[in-house]
Amino acid sequence: MADKLYQIKLDIKKGKNIVGSDGSVCSPYLRVTWGGKKQQKTKVITKSAEPEWNFSCLLEIKKEKNPQKPGLEFELIEHKQFSEKEISSTTYQLPESLILGEACNYSVPMSIATSKGDQKCEILIAITAINFGKDKQDEEKKRHDEIQKKFAQLVEQLATDSKAREGMMKLPYEARAQLVEQHRDKLANEKHPDEYVVLLIKEITRKNIQLAGGLQKSHSASNASLGSLSPVTPRVDDGLSVAELKNISVALRSRGLDWIHQFHKLGATTRLVELLSLYVNKKSHTEESLQKQLECLNCIKNLMNNNVGIGYIFGIKDSFKTIVLCLGSEYEKVNELAIGLLNTICFLPKINGHKLLIELLNYFKEEKKESRRFISIVKSLKSKAGVIETKETLKTKSIYLSFINIIVNTPAEIDLRLALRQEFYWLGIKEILVKLSNYTYDESPELDTQITVFEEEESKDNKEMSERFQEFKGLNLDNVDDVLKTLMDRIRPKGLVDCMREISKDLLLLPIDDDVGIRNWVLASRIIKQISLRDKNIGIDEDILPLENLLLMCEQEAKEVPLKSQIESLKKDAQDLAKKITTQDIELKEKVEIIKKNEELTTKQLEEQINIAKKKDEEINQLKALVEQLKLTQGTAKPDSAAASTSVAPPPPPPPMTGGGAPPPPPPPPPMTGGGGPPPPPPPPPMTGGGPPPPPPPPPMTGGGPPPPPPPPGGGPPPPPPPPGAKAGGPPPPPPPFGKGPPPPPGGFGMKKAAAPPRKEVPVPALKMKGLQWVSLNDKKIQGTIFSKFNLDTSKDINLDYKDIEGVFAAKVIEKKESTAPKKTGPVSIIDPKTSQNLSIFLSQFKGKSYDDICGAISKGDETVFQPNHIDALIGFLPSEDDINNINEFLREEKDITKLGPPEQFSMKIHSVPQVKARLQAMKFKYAYESKKSDLKVDIDNFKQGTQEIKGSEKIPKLLEVILILGNFINGGTARGNAYGFKLNTITKLADTKSTDNKLSLVNYLTRVVIKDFPHLNSFAQDLGHVEAAGRVSLSQVQAEVATLRKEFVQVQKSIETLNSGTGEEAVDPFKVKYEEFCTQTAEDIDLITSSSQQIETDYKDLLAMFGEDSKSEPSEFFGMFTKFMDQYDKATKENEQLSIQAEKIAKREAAKKLKEEEDAKKKQLAEERKQKGETVEVKESVVDDLLDTIASGDAFKNRRRRARKTDQDSTIEPIDL
């Protein structure tokens, strides 16, 4: 019966990725039938996506009915509480490779249709053929033969020489089978290199035909109107697929050197680069074409993973130009691989890889029409708006940044590194790195590593650059005067002053007003920098800096110069605005305090008035009670009225006041007969001080003012005048009338000065003469000069020929001719020529303003017409008395003011303004006052706030106590230990105490203690916001400035008081009214500033005493100690944070490094075990991969500073011919 059946044993082991129809985990079981016979089913596994059935059954069918052995039918059932549902089914054909009596494992694929889409799953089974199948011995023999064949192929691929080949052929069968299994990928691809060459040539031909067809198509379109037929494009197949390119890449990675050599010898390497060029230069790219670019690059990378392949790639002309054009691809994988290949050329031996890389990037800029070199690389680092970065995108950015690090940090010359880094600064790399630094190490270890490399290399270069100026110790490089002085001192002994003068003269001729001029200045700066850093010519060595690129850099920097100027201007405006706001805040606080004080005072006064009113009410009540009592008393007594009248004597006169004054005047005479009025009361006694009675009124003003009013009737005669020379303390006599000088000295009243000696009379010329321009002196000015000695006697021998002089110096008489040309006349200049020229230049600033407008503005105090510097200039240009006299003398002769020059005309105008100098001085003070007041108030407020912040801080004392205990422990057992306190400057010396390894200071340790045990003290610096500003204030300077301001104000105040009142239509001088109001407000301000400056000095001395400091300590020293300590504390806190972060990063890197070392050790151990067994171990080259790993870890840059630059910079790798 068994001979008529096919029998198999089926083991259903488990399922994978099984879900229900709704896409969630279900409770499945499986039904299976073979040839339509009895169904077998497994048990139900509750809620499992990977149910383990472990079910076995025997299946059989009749050979007669099923000669072809049908497939196994599987049904996957979803079991539910009240229903069952088939969720998938399939038929699995029995494999032809079944071996009689041997179990073979298989996987049955299935698909489940869910509400969320199709779900792939599989069933793991084992089939044992019981009475049919292949013979085991026959199959083992076939397998043995196959392994021997494949091993022979493997020997050809792996054995590089005859010795290695001989060693491999001695391996036993088991080792050979193991090697074949290990190199299955290599053996699976059995194509010969010539097959791939054919594929590459076909693809290149197809692309060229497509390109030619496109040209023909466009040509035919242009001729369509002529009715010509377009040529037929030859039919080509679909071309090289992505899968076929992948096969080439796999072959290049897995095959041996003989295969690679044969591949190159057949021209496939050249075809590969040519094909990549066709893909790159395509105008538009599809997803498939981009994938083909990637696979071409993978092929090149696998070729370059060994030194032989590197030689092949370098031997192809423009191979790397093709690779560099892959940059900027829409597919980031292409960019990453292209960058990786370009990065490696900087580390290859025997070539100047960096120079080649810079040349390639210059070529890329020209081909892609970029405005700036490297701009596309920097743009790729920027995050797109609204796009959230993932770990993959951050890794991509780390590759771009590694490329920048290679470009900038590979050269051995610091000047080249600085120049290249500066290019990236201008492209905005610093701002981008600041944003990228926000991502943590865990989010992207690769990006964090590259940012660290960039910053560390930048810091080291800056330090190295600063060492170049070590010979100029103490030189302030930011001060141009100091730099120029040092330069002159340096070149003078060498005789280079002439060269410096020529350079300076040329610089003097450079324009500065337009963009071209600014660009020239920047270019000159860059060229001199290049000369100072290099001994090569600009633009010759492109590895240093091409001249064209230097010009582009200068153009960009020139554009930034006006922007920097605008930024500085805006900063200054912002500072002025902030200063103004601060001043207003201070004044607001002052006014609030005044209001509070007034409110308190008003409340106090009201209380006093209420108390006084209460007392008066009580007194009135008492008086009323007394009156009532007196009325009762008068009612009982009846005295005689006459007796009463005689008994009451008049009150005695009041005693004279102390002070020894004059006795009171006698009592007035009795009243006249008929006078009904009572006698007037006696006059009051004289006031304390005993001064004489007031003096008589002054004589009336010139012009006849009304006499003073008579004394009131009945008041007695006026008091007598004081005796001459009385000094009893009375008021001083009134001043003389305004405009009158003091009386002449005794004996000199009405006397005249000595007259000038008689002079020789000089006749007046009959003709108009050419004038002699001189400044004449009148008789008053020659007193005591040599001119006072000239008289009739000294001049009697001077007899000039006046007729001859008249003929020689007579003004030329020009006959009037009929002419339309205007008559040219020159203005007369009397003032000193230099002063006149400066005044003319100054007046030209007042465009559209007449001299009357200017002088009227001065007269009325109109500040809108002037700038602050105008007032100073006007004071300097005020005409002297001699100038006015000379101008007046000219006008007496000429009678025409229009003949005078503008400076002379203006001088006459401004001289006519009453008390012009006093007005200008007042305006000058007012212009400067607001700025001075603001500066003083800000300084005083900062000082006050700083003092109060330290004095009122609760954290400072506790912090000092911590420092005291910490210091006592460190100094324990020494003379400095067991201290009760310390000088305040100790807090600035904590940073000088270093740890045992010199990596940390006592400040670092203090911050750790504070953060751990006293976290509330960590923010102590936030409470000391004004301390730094207070340290910049000099108390002595503030006091001096307050005194100077008060002195200037008093002078202005006096000058305003002496101004005349208005005359004519204006009864009041508007200038005086305006400035009197200003003086009133200013007086209050200055009083407040004075009192505040005195108060802060008192508070400061109290603060010094509080900390045990010398009372003479300067604020800059005292507050500076706190400022320095705060800076050190803040720096130490950040250092601790950075050290903590860095330690964490190092720990993670070490863990990753250790893991990699363990994996490498396992591989090495495995290789060693195989070697001991007699197996030949292939050591696979991976030049590119190893270099990329080194760059990604940052190790590639660590030894750059120790490497000497190769002297042979023009050598290249020679193509290798095998």
Curated annotation (Swiss-Prot):
One of its GO terms (cellular component) is cleavage furrow. The keyword Amino-acid biosynthesis does not apply. Pfam families: C2 (PF00168), Drf_FH3 (PF06367), Drf_GBD (PF06371), FH2 (PF02181). Residues 1-108 form the C2 domain. Residues 139-539 form the GBD/FH3 domain. Keywords: Actin-binding, Coiled coil. GO terms for biological process: 'de novo' actin filament nucleation; actin filament polymerization; actin nucleation; cell migration; cortical actin cytoskeleton organization; mitotic cytokinesis; negative regulation of bleb assembly; sorocarp development. GO terms for molecular function: actin filament binding; phosphatidylinositol binding; profilin binding; small GTPase binding. InterPro entries: ARM-like (IPR011989), ARM-type_fold (IPR016024), C2_dom (IPR000008), C2_domain_sf (IPR035892), DAD_dom (IPR014767), FH2_Formin (IPR015425), FH2_Formin_sf (IPR042201), FH3_dom (IPR010472). Residues 759-1155 form the FH2 domain. Residues 1174-1209 form the DAD domain. Residues 634-762, 1153-1179, 1198-1218 are annotated as: Disordered. Disruption phenotype: No visible phenotype. ForA and forB double null cells also show no phenotype. CDD domains: C2. Residues 563-638, 1034-1061 form a coiled coil. Residues 652-737 form the FH1 domain. Residues 649-747 have a biased composition (Pro residues). The DAD domain regulates activation via by an autoinhibitory interaction with the GBD/FH3 domain. This autoinhibition is released upon competitive binding of an activated GTPase. The release of DAD allows the FH2 domain to then nucleate and elongate nonbranched actin filaments. Interacts (via GBD/FH3 domain) with activated Rho-GTPases. Formins play an important role in the nucleation of actin and the formation of linear actin filaments. Belongs to the formin homology family. Diaphanous subfamily. This is Formin-A. It comes from Dictyostelium discoideum (Social amoeba).
